[in-house]
Amino acid sequence: MSDTDGKKPLGLGGGSRSGQVKQSFSHGRTKSVLVETKRKRVVVPKPGASGSSTTTSSPSHLGDPAKRPAGISDAEMERRLAALRAAKLREVEDAKRRADEERQREEERQRRREELEAKEREERERAEALRQKAEDEERARREAEEAARRAEEAKRAPAPAAPQPAPAESRASAPPSAKPGLPPSRKEREREADRDRTTKKDDSRRSGKLTLNEALSGEGGRTRSLAAMKRKQEKARQKAMGFGHKAEKQVRDVQLPETILVQELANRMAERAADVVKALMKMGMMVTMNQSIDADTAELVIEEFGHRAVRVSDADVEHVIDTVEDKAEDLQPRPPIITIMGHVDHGKTSLLDAIRKTSVVSGEAGGITQHIGAYQVKTESGAVLTFLDTPGHAAFTSMRARGAQVTDIVVLVVAADDAVMPQTVEAIKHAKAAKVPMIVAINKIDKPDADPNKVRTDLLQHEVIVEKMSGDVLDVEVSAKTGLGLDELLENIALQAEILDLRANPSRQAQGAVIEAKLDVGRGPVATVLVQYGTLKRGDIFVVGQQWGKVRALINDKGERVDEAGPSVPVEVLGLNGTPEAGDVLNVVETEAQAREIADYREKAARDKRAAAGAATTLEQLMAKAKADADVAELPVVIKADVQGSAEAIVQALEKVGNDEVRVRVLHYGVGAITETDITLAEASQAAVIGFNVRANASARQAANQKSVEIRYYSVIYDLVDDVKKAASGLLKAEVREHFIGYAQIKEVFRITGVGNVAGCIVTEGVARRSAGVRLLRDNIVIHEGTLKTLKRFKDEVKEVQSGQECGMAFERYEDIRPGDVIEIFEREEVQRKLA
């Protein structure tokens, strides 16, 4: 080793080094610069240095300044040592953190390894159990074959001598297949070992309970829990019964509406929603489980999952309505339903009054029937008859049609002094369309000018042949005023009902027809229902048209509350959620949910139908409709009536009012009092509000006064239709009529400055007026039509010139006049038109 001990010798040349650098500038100029480079010596402590010098913060640890590296101050040295300590501390923390992470990773690896070993052990046990089961089955099969073979040999071979009896212990221990006197074979020894192992396994499986002695002695080790024992027993039981195999997929019938949510489709198939979404994505549809798909796509998905699709429609909700045919043994006799029809003022209601021995006509406005009345009459013979009284006015066509649809017998009332009239013919058509028998009642037979034979003859023109004319239609001459022939009429009705043999099942769910509907102020929506099948009871839940409800009360034709109504019984039904349409069918259902669902479906179907009817199919049709509407003036009205039938009759009557130039537009019609909503609607459309047998409430009257909306009240449909006709006639353009008043012959044409050409004329016929219109005729051809600018007589402006006098005329904005032309003078008159 040298004296320097591997260190470099110190020298004096280690301070700084100098040199020159040449700088270049533009235009080829250069400059030499003297550069001095200084080097700093950094002292690093040796690795074996004591740590005490770095842990104290006193100035003594900085050492002797003479031994410190050059250029390092105390503060710099302190900062460097602090940084060194922080670095060592971080290194210790990092090492600790890495050790913790390594330990956690090792624990995770150990846990996974244990799980894998447990899984492998479980797989081995399962495989061992399966192998053991297979061996047991194979061994049992071989033993059965061996036993069968020995039995077959024993049958063929002669009976051997009885062997010497062996000791009891040997017989008990030897297996059945072992032959006496021979040592056990290898297979038998293996079989015995398997049996012992199975027995031990079964004992350990059933040793789940831990006794006190075992716990205190500490023998037996840790046993499995009771839950684990039960799970193992359940697995063994399922394996023995063959449940270990994968269950077969259950094929389901999936109800498929027109549109369905993906989640709902998955629920109906009992599949995971994610699988259904995945299947749809494979089909190119990026949907979520909350989106709807159409029925065709859903059917493809259902078939892909192996199920069967059953298409259903929204209309299937009505299948809950009972439409089963009644059995013959359940049918019982029911009263006949008789509808009285005929022309207005022929005495239908008066005839019914005479039968009921009451007065109904006095209660009808104007003495005419404006509602369908339903009554039950009990005759002297004890028979019960149900009568329907229909209006005879032309506006009530739909009411008569409804009466004919629900009736069994039609009584056609014809006045003997008036014969067959238009509504009589209409009633005959309704009766024939309904295919119901008809009885002709020739009324007003007590009048002096009554001619029943004329009635019978007129009926022949409409293919109604009465018995007295060798036909099959019954006819009776009656007088509602004197009561003549009423008994015979009732006998004929009873005879006809007996022939029809009318029967119905009162035990089924009720079904009936709405004869009339109204909105009562105190009772709400009220429907007059004629029960056709079954029995309607209080508390029944029903659906009628687009409305539904629960029977709150039943009121018969005498105003009495009843608990139930059987077939052919007319009642007023309270408890509806809205006013139904007259003619709707009432059906009783099981639950409110069914009734609400059916009503909602019907309302949606009606709304879609109206939208489809109002929508134009092409742009050309839309433009043509808009052009046609622009040429037609409209009279908007809002109709409110006391009952649904009257409202419909008014609307139908007003639809017939008008022509190609004007029409009545019904903005809204309904049942009940006039409300503020009706006033608001009328004010927005500048319409009038018409109330038929109803009045406006206080708020509606106040709103009408503020908004200047006209409200008109009527109780007779004649007056209502006539007033609307007058109002609609005011929208017609006035008819312009021309009246010829004279001719003038042009003799000479003069040119006057400031006026133009002036014709010197002589009035040849009639009179010439300054305010009249004129036509210029040349060779009997009209070449100009206009007005006069001036009419003078001897330089004086005059209003008219009589025949035979001369005058001067100048035309307004026209000067092509010649001698010999003829001027035709006429006046126009506007005449107000009226609707027919």
Curated annotation (Swiss-Prot):
Biased composition (Polar residues): 18-27
Gene3D superfamilies per record: P-loop containing nucleotide triphosphate hydrolases (3.40.50.300), Translation factors (2.40.30.10), Translation initiation factor IF- 2, domain 3 (3.40.50.10050)
Ranges where the record places region G2: 367-371
GO molecular function, one term: GTPase activity
Summary of the function given for this chain in its UniProt record: One of the essential components for the initiation of protein synthesis. Protects formylmethionyl-tRNA from spontaneous hydrolysis and promotes its binding to the 30S ribosomal subunits. Also involved in the hydrolysis of GTP during the formation of the 70S ribosomal complex.
Region Disordered, annotated ranges: 1-233
Protein's UniProt name: Translation initiation factor IF-2
